[in-house]
Amino acid sequence: MVPDYAARVVAEDRLGEVRVIGGADASSTRFDPDRAVHAALVALSWPGLDRLGQAGAVKRGGLPYIPGLLGFREVPALLDAWEALAPRPGLVLVDGHGLAHPRGLGIASLLGVVLDVPTIGVAKSILVGEVEGPLGEAAGAQAPLVWQGRQIGVAIRLRRGANPVFVSVGHRVSLPTALGWVARTGRGYRLPEPTRLAHLAAAEVRRGADGGAG
């Protein structure tokens, strides 16, 4: 199953003019007996990054937690949110990895392949590989993320002194293009604006599912 999806990932630019850019975020708790996934997507104007739409979804009873297969657990909830989202983005930045994944199929790549939409992985931590060379403290500082002798992503710092994010190809974008979009959508926070707003939206979904607690 995983190799079939991984073989369909396109790591080159096949995207049109982007007028609406999306952000996607999903979260689940490892030991939750309900196996609930809380997901959200936002649609933002480009280049203004004004919020045009937002949709959330909760999916219960999915796959158990399996290391390396988290995308298969969380993507179904993102698909439900996608169905409710308007307008539809021409490019989606996903909170999580794309090709920077031990199976070459992180959540950003899986979502992109299933929807056949250009996606970019924007992760907050490293799953595999190491950052090679120095990574400066200034906003915009970059260094390659390398695994098994090949570059699988780029670490970039969007805010001076903040922890970097780790950018990788999701689907239908090249790594240079992915990096360019992440850099251009930074607005002074650690995360690029699409995934930052998607993270906040997913937190709203979780609070709503919990009856407003937290």
Task: Annotate each language-model stretch with its function.
Residues 101-151:
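A contiguous pocket-lining binding segment that forms or flanks enzyme active sites
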Residues 19-30:
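Two-metal-ion RNase H-like nuclease active-site motif
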Residues 1-9, 75, 80, 133-214:
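C-terminal binding/interaction regions
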Residues 31-88:
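A glycine-rich, hydrophobic loop/mini-helix early in the fold
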Residues 78-111, 115-117:
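Catalytic-site beta-strand/loop segments enriched in glycine and acidic/polar residues
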Residues 24, 94-95, 121-123:
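Short beta-strand segments
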Residues 7-17:
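A short acidic-Thr-Gly-centered motif at the start of a beta-strand
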Residues 64-69, 94-102, 162-169:
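Flexible, glycine/proline-enriched loop segments at strand-loop-helix junctions
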